[in-house]
Curated annotation (Swiss-Prot):
A molecular-function term among this protein's GO annotations: metal ion binding
Alphabetical UniProt keywords: 2Fe-2S, Chloroplast, Disulfide bond, Electron transport, Iron, Iron-sulfur, Membrane, Metal-binding, Plastid, Thylakoid, Transit peptide, Translocase, Transmembrane, Transmembrane helix, Transport
Disulfide bonds: C139-C154
Gene encoding the protein: petC
InterPro entries: Rieske_2Fe-2S (IPR017941), Rieske_2Fe-2S_sf (IPR036922), Rieske_Fe-S_prot (IPR014349), Rieske_Fe-S_prot_C (IPR005805)
Protein name, UniProt field: Cytochrome b6-f complex iron-sulfur subunit, chloroplastic
């Protein structure tokens, strides 16, 4: 009888011990689970952070793009006064006094397009101007004096000193415009509709 009573008393103790063991296992598992990062939550946070970070970058890119896209492209009809960065008419003497031989600087040309005025080797204004709009996707192409060429910052197209395309993806040379100095010294642009002297072909912009 004593043995039976002892066994009966021990049974509840074992059951309690088993329950405690299970409870402890659940607690440990919960603790470990809380320490392991939830991949779904991490992915969501990464997307949020990426989206937030992309906003200022996107705005910057848009601002940059807008700077290089001109208001229009191609030539116009009739003569038009060339204008400087402030919108003032350009006079030949004043321009030559501040621009050296070989200089290529932007002015406002036909239809308001950015157009290069060229100073020749003998110190006069060249008889033609170059529309600065890239023939690929319309970026304004800077003149790189150190390399004696125009290089597009958008997709790498290049043009020689006369605006002839020498490297793509631009398919065509820069558009030409006649450039003349009037009797009063005013510099004017007019449409170039003759053969393109650089290629021997009809002007694609006319």
């Amino acid at each position: 009888m004593a043995m039976i009573t002892s066994r009966r008393a021990a049974a509840p103790c074992k059951a309690q011990a088993t329950r405690r063991s299970r409870v402890m296992s659940v607690v440990r598992a919960a603790a470990v689970s809380s320490e392991v990062p939830d991949m779904n939550k991490r992915n969501i946070m990464n997307l949020i952070l990426l989206g937030g970070a992309s906003l200022p970058v996107g705005s910057l890119a848009l601002g940059y793009g807008a700077f290089f896209v001109p208001p229009s492209s191609g030539g116009g009809s009739g003569g038009q006064a060339a204008k400087d960065a402030l919108g003032n008419d350009i006079k030949a003497n004043a321009w030559l006094a501040t621009h050296q031989k070989g200089d290529r600087s932007l002015s406002q040309g036909l239809k308001g397009d950015p157009t290069y005025l060229i100073v020749t080797a003998d110190g006069t204004i060249e008889k033609y101007g170059l529309n600065a709009v890239c023939t690929h996707l319309g970026c304004v192409v800077p003149w790189v004096a150190a390399e004696n060429k125009f290089k597009c910052p958008c997709h790498g197209s290049q043009y020689n000193a006369e605006g002839k395309v020498v490297r793509g993806p631009a398919p065509l040379s820069l558009a030409l415009a006649h450039c003349d100095v009037q009797e009063d010294g005013l510099v004017t642009f007019s449409t170039w509709s003759e053969t393109d002297f650089r290629t021997g072909l009809e002007p694609w912009w006319a």
